[in-house]
Swiss-Prot record:
This is Transthyretin. L-thyroxine binds at residues 38, 77, 140. The N-terminus strongly influences thyroid hormone-binding properties. One of its GO terms (molecular function) is identical protein binding. The modification Sulfocysteine is found at residue 33. The lineage of its organism: Eukaryota, Metazoa, Chordata, Craniata, Vertebrata.
Length: 153
């Protein structure tokens, strides 16, 4: 039980830090970044660096088109996953290659991939920061959705 309480507290702490950092980042240097991710390795308590991430947009026939891909930086982040023009109203999927990530660390994970599927920009253009907390056998995710800056109008 103590393990789960510790994990819950760690999750709250990390996600609250991701939230505050995302708020400042989007309002400053990355004001034109409509989609970014922040991934944390809960086993080691550090950012999940070198994690491959793909962004897909759902078509009308429910198939998926790859929009972009990237790898998290040393701080566990990827900025500019989509341009303002690409990131229109629709359903999107972020695919995190978790098995590849954990295998490189010598661990055998449960999940091949972690997919985060969400609807974007259905209430007007917004900026999205998705935070993901990973372990080899679990994940948790949250999002910060911020309003458009005047520069985007």
């Amino acid at each position: 039980m103590a393990y789960y309480n510790t994990l819950a507290l760690l999750t709250i702490f990390i996600f609250s830090g991701a939230f505050h950092r995302a708020q400042g980042t989007h309002g400053e240097a990355d004001s034109k970044c409509p989609l970014m991710v922040k991934v944390l390795d809960a086993v080691r308590g550090i950012p999940a660096a070198k994690l491959p991430v793909k962004v897909f947009k759902q078509n009308e026939d429910k198939s998926w088109d790859l929009i972009s891909s990237g790898t998290t930086s040393s701080d566990g982040e990827i900025h500019n996953l989509a341009t303002e023009e690409q990131f229109v109203e629709g359903i999107y999927k972020l695919e995190f290659a978790t098995k590849r990530f954990w295998s490189k660390l010598g661990l055998t994970p449960f999940h091949e991939y972690v997919d985060v599927v969400f609807t974007a920009n259905d209430a007007g253009h917004r900026h999205y920061t998705t935070a993901v907390l990973l372990t080899p056998y679990s994940f948790s995710t949250t999002a910060v959705v911020s309003d458009v800056k005047e520069a985007h109008v």
